[in-house]
């Protein structure tokens, strides 16, 4: 990692502005597209293999019926209409013409290519679109789907968002993920090899049942070895109507405290490659469904806490990153 100091930053982290000590998504958007972009959540009505019985039933224990698409329109609304509505709403917060359609809800490659192709290609024709983001699972990337993603990556800035959550198979089984870490790495490597222009964003959850800080950071270390283009760090939310809510209400799950979460995020950032974009350092649970932790509603406070902790420790993203000499999954 370079130790060249960014002008006025007071620390040697290069991929940031405004004094940030990690590679923010906002910085990447400005560097890539020349300014802010609105990411438009969409629900295309797909299912998941751990919902329909292919590798399990009921989905992940923390997942609502919307499959991480709680902020998208209902799937019954046509995709273009979803896009236009959400674009109008987000324009009040981020007045920008640049937009990235985000196929977010559930597993968005869990269908034949004949179904996927027209959906994704149509999205590229919508007004203001400068890129495309597709959320899926690494075990839902057959060869013909990867070939389609490679085609799309030649036409636009494509981000494929892969849910991993944990590198520990015991935890993955407990939360009903329906795949192992080896499954994830196999899918990741094939995507990296066959669609080299596609950006890969890996999703991780901190605070999963049975995991302490050491276990969480071991997941981050393993992911850092893969050198993904982007990472999202999520706080585990307890949402009404989920299996996790039942566990929580029965006293079988204790959510992270804010200070614990901030400390874990700081240590996670230190382990990640400095070039990796940190697309999220916390998440949003639908307010009406959030049971715990209630402190997570104060998102700005959490973000400020992370910035303050990094500054207090005089540390930054990648400070403790140790690259492997060789790794078949690297670019």
PLM region spans:
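Auxiliary Fe-S-binding modules of radical SAM enzymes
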Residues: 1-27, 36-38, 230, 238-331
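Conserved non-cysteine loop/helix-boundary elements of the Radical SAM core domain that shape
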Residues: 68-77, 105-118, 132-195, 206-227, ...
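Active-site phosphate/pyrophosphate- and oxyanion-stabilizing loops and adjacent acidic/basic residues
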Residues: 27, 121, 147, 189, ...
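Short, electropositive alpha-helical surface patch
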Residues: 117-122, 150, 211-229, 285-307
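Long, charge-rich boundary regions
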Residues: 87-120
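Hydrophobic faces of well-ordered beta-strands that scaffold small-molecule active sites
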Residues: 38-42, 99-101, 132-134, 158-162, ...
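N-terminal [4Fe-4S]-dependent radical SAM core
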Residues: 1-100
